[in-house]
């Protein structure tokens, strides 16, 4: 008679804050969307923003769209973990849903710029895993912005002008990926997430597991 299979070992851990940044058009949103579709342990931190909603975007799914006055009220009441002004618009991360998810062991994905990433590192560095996505060339970056066909030519040129300043912050991130092949870039991000979830200091349930393991008396 074969012995019954034991249940998979479940070790409690604290959720991680996965930050993915890049200049517009480098691929962070596509990578983020694919992660959310394929990994049930990851939830999206939905940012608040004052920018105009694009035709393809859904309220409270892609962003919480707010007026400048509403945004300032959230910021001034300490309801945002981080905030930044990007391309003339305000963006910020609501505090409450993130802290709740982290405490329950769920990972939160942040599609934010270097300013937001910097603020999160300053406030919650032990929880943050940051990834910067680079385009293979500036020419390809420009082509992707045109293919997206969601912004005017004026907006595209503004994004290109700002991209060099954004790229200059790549050294501030834990990991850097060149997105010349989307599948390869996605594989790299998934590998990072798997490894970071196994870090000893993130798995607070490991202490009890090891203690019980050492106290166990084997029985045949």
Swiss-Prot record:
Keywords noted in UniProt: ATP-binding, Cytoplasm, Kinase, Nucleotide-binding, Transferase
Reactions mediated catalytically: GMP + ATP = GDP + ADP
Entries under Pfam families matching the protein: Guanylate_kin
Binding-site positions, ATP: 22-29
InterPro entries referenced in this protein's UniProt entry, alphabetically: GK/Ca_channel_bsu, Guanylate_kin-like_dom, Guanylate_kinase, P-loop_NTPase
One cellular component (GO) term of this entry: cytosol
Domain Guanylate kinase-like: 15-194
Compartments in which it is found: Cytoplasm
Enzyme Commission no: 2.7.4.8
CDD domains associated with the record: GMPK
GO molecular function annotation: ATP binding; guanylate kinase activity
Function text: Essential for recycling GMP and indirectly, cGMP.
Entry similarity comment: Belongs to the guanylate kinase family.
HAMAP family in the record: Guanylate_kinase (MF_00328)
Name this polypeptide is given: Guanylate kinase
